[in-house]
Amino acid sequence: MKRFELIAPCHFGLEAVLKHEITELGYDVIQVEDGRVTFAGDAEAVCCANIYLRSAERILIKIGSFQAQTYEELFQGTKSLPWEEFIPTDGRFWVTKAASVKSRLFSPSDIQSVMKKAMVERMKEVHHIEWFSEEGASFPIRVFLMKDEVTAALDTTGVSLHKRGYRKLTAKAPIAENLAAALIMLTPWNSGRILVDPFCGSGTFPIEAAMMAANIAPGVNRSFTAQQWPHLIEPRQWEEIRQEAAEQADAGVETDIQAYDIDENVVALARANARMAGVEHLIHFQQRSVKDLSHSKKYGFIITNPPYGERMEEKKSLPGLYGMIGERFKALDSWSMYLITSYERAEEAMGLKAAKNRKIYNGMMKTYFYQFPGPKPPKKK
């Protein structure tokens, strides 16, 4: 069976979470770099990674890499790669994205244009064909340039993996599903411990936690670009892995996940999203202000993405809001709290000092993941 070098991009700062996920699936990690993890795998690995990985953004098949400081070197390097091993003569292929960091070549549109021409020339020479219809399956290509090293890869995913298919409606500034899942995995939370999100918004944190508790694979109900590539991945492989994933889900799991928001319309929206994800029955939704946050249970978790003041008038209310968060958390003396925000003065406003403060880039926005771990519950005798 053909082996691939697979690349899984992720949010900057969360590479260790993705590496652990890949290792848990049974695949060998080759390299961990800023914002991506490279691992070895076959066609089945492409299916498994797309369907099971919670923190990845997409799964790429590496075609090759080379050095290029000029567009001529880019053309020749691209032409030297074995495109014909992956793309059939009727395939529709193009460079969907080019990213350049610390490299001589930096114009995405020029990089895309030159590489497309080189790929066509390669295919012409190999297949002895002058014209390609490009009416078949899509083969989107992603290119990274880092310090003049060009890496070209086929995108097996298509629409980003954070699109699970359940979030048809969104509240303001929703957190990406794969980012929420990765942050939950950074905490010690498990399905036997209560989880509360007092700013649930679209419901992403509670829904992702419920999917983990029920062992629902994040990609089980969506499609992928590589499903149209039977010459590389047999259709039965997709079907078998989807079936395995569906059989492993446990919709009857007992867990205590609670989602609150001050806006009743937002709560209704979050509930609708949970219904789409098949986990509505696992989450208690309630219209509730953070100032009313209290709980009789011990050793619970607050995992949340509070408002961080996108507009100037909102920023003025942040000290008071975060002060209230700190006050309510202090009253929950055995609890743990994990929150992500771009508000730089969050600790000061809450009157708390985080045990850890991890910087995470959410797109181009620098955010902070504040971690306030509480005591561990006593072991059951």
Where are these regions (language model features)?
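Non-catalytic nucleic-acid substrate-recognition regions in nucleic-acid-modifying enzymes
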Residues: K2-F139, K381
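Flexible, glycine-/basic-rich loop-and-beta segments that form/coincide
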Residues: C48-S55, V159-R164, K168, G374-K381
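SAM-dependent Rossmann-like transferase core, predominantly class I methyltransferases
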Residues: A152-L186
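A short, flexible beta-alpha/helix-coil linker loop
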Residues: S100-S103, S160, P307-R311
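C-terminal catalytic and target-recognition region of SAM-dependent MTase-like enzymes
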Residues: S289-K381
